[in-house]
Amino acid sequence: MNQTIFNFSAGPAVLPHVVLEQVQAELLDWHGSGMSVMEMSHRGPEFMKIAAEAEQDLRDLLDIPANYKILFLQGGATLQFAMVPLNLMRGHGKASYVQTGIWSKKAIAEARRFTAVEIAASNEDRHASYVPMQADWQVSPDTAYVHITGNETIGGVEFDFIPDLGDIPLVSDASSHILSKPTDVSRFGLIYAGAQKNIGPAGLTLVIVRDDLLGHAPANTATMLDYAVYAKEESMHNTPPTFAIYVAGLVFKWLKQLGGLERMAEINARKARLLYDAIDESRGFYANPVETRNRSRMNVPFTLADAAMDEAFLKGARSHGLIQLKGHRSVGGMRASIYNAMPEAGVQILADYLRDFARQHG
């Protein structure tokens, strides 16, 4: 294919081209070992080196304190919706959740299988278009933890602050914005993220958890759902997703070579500005429903003034090499996911196309 394709999928999502090239070059023979990474024993010295480097590079990128464990798990963020309450209740009678969209609702529904859930705040009063300020939250002092969804992938709503909860552990689903900017990990009790948006291929789930929150799962908790098991055995209780860890490790190295998360944050801010400016300047031809301070830098949903033009818009986008722009099935419209690996050039082409299409059809 001669045309450059820019993939705006929400996940699995675009990976850095240089990472894909390295994967291709090493696919049949990793570093002269005579093996593909896919063929390696997860306990062999070759893969142990890959895993150790991936963990250290991630620790460096996020400046993760020594009293936090990094776990490489499976099951996606959806499994974390259950693992979090299973492991973090610690004898408390309830957990608190901030409801900001579809994914936080899913986390709430799953948590209710295991404990009482207190809705500390909700944005449904304004059609899930903002993040409630912490001053408006109602959090019981005896709650086990407070859970937030840092970025709602479908609604395009992103937190613009880290809540200060004192001694109450803060838990964040960071699946779609992890590594997009510097983050003070010490402000959180636990962070989890499915890999397939900003980390690497599907199949890997990342958990960063503070040491004091380990070891509290009920005695009858299934072994594979206990964080302490993975922490004790360095994510090797059973065979981990080896190839996904390998690719994630390459992405971590790419981020470090780029200049780290401060540099990545600058690039992401520019990319998001390109799209939101094109939407806002369209005089209503396009609309994004999210309040400005909470507009996601990673997922930009928008609608056309006339939904009858959606198919023409998507067809035209495809002719420009812009794919996977159709919105989530639950909300319709369009969505451009512009994760770390999406080149700025691709976002510029999309912004130009938005303006051209509006001129032709407005």
Swiss-Prot record:
Location of this chain's protein in the cell: Cytoplasm
Residues at which pyridoxal 5'-phosphate binds: A77, T78, W103, T153, D173, Q196, N238, T239
Protein origin, superkingdom: Bacteria
Binding site for L-glutamate: R43
Record lineage: Bacteria, Pseudomonadati, Pseudomonadota, Acidithiobacillia, Acidithiobacillales
Protein name according to UniProt: Phosphoserine aminotransferase
Cofactor requirements of the protein: pyridoxal 5'-phosphate
Catalytic reactions of this protein: O-phospho-L-serine + 2-oxoglutarate = 3-phosphooxypyruvate + L-glutamate; 4-(phosphooxy)-L-threonine + 2-oxoglutarate = (R)-3-hydroxy-2-oxo-4-phosphooxybutanoate + L-glutamate
Similarity comment text for this entry: Belongs to the class-V pyridoxal-phosphate-dependent aminotransferase family. SerC subfamily.
Functional summary from the UniProt entry: Catalyzes the reversible conversion of 3-phosphohydroxypyruvate to phosphoserine and of 3-hydroxy-2-oxo-4-phosphonooxybutanoate to phosphohydroxythreonine.
Subunit architecture: Homodimer.
GO MF term (any one): O-phospho-L-serine:2-oxoglutarate aminotransferase activity
A UniProt-annotated Pfam family: Aminotran_5
Pathway in which the depicted protein is active: Amino-acid biosynthesis; L-serine biosynthesis; L-serine from 3-phospho-D-glycerate: step 2/3; Cofactor biosynthesis; pyridoxine 5'-phosphate biosynthesis; pyridoxine 5'-phosphate from D-erythrose 4-phosphate: step 3/5
